[in-house]
Regions:
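Non-catalytic ligand/cofactor/substrate-binding and regulatory segments of enzyme domains
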Residues: 1-91, 98-112
Length: 114
């Protein structure tokens, strides 16, 4: 079992607009989707973003291997080319990954972007 967190960062867009970016932390890795496609990295602070909120979404029984295979399956929808800041973005990706992880208590995380 692994704990699942929704991370919400803020960042400057066009130097005058502040936007939010979401990531999922599970199996001690941060999984995100952005203008570079899907990224998976060790859990750490982001240099270009400020961590605003961490929401505990529950625990999952999905293994690291199963999650990796799932990400390989959905990567065709979340490529660098398919990224759209306001439609096909980190929030949509985070919601889909949270649903796949089927956490035992992910209702609060789903409320944010459902």
């Amino acid at each position: 079992m692994s704990e699942v967190y929704l991370l919400i960062y803020t960042f400057k867009f066009l130097q005058f607009l502040t936007l939010e970016h979401t990531e999922i932390r599970v199996h001690e890795r941060d999984i995100a989707y952005g203008r570079h496609g899907i990224t998976v990295s060790p859990s750490e602070d982001r240099e270009d973003m400020i961590l605003k909120t961490i929401i505990f979404c529950g625990t999952t029984e999905v293994t690291d291997l199963d999650l990796t295979q799932y990400l390989m399956h959905i990567h065709v929808f979340f490529t660098k080319k398919n990224y759209q800041l306001f439609t096909n973005n980190c929030r949509k990706f985070s919601t889909i990954v949270l649903r796949y992880l089927d956490t035992d208590d992910n209702e609060e995380g789903n409320k944010i972007y459902a």
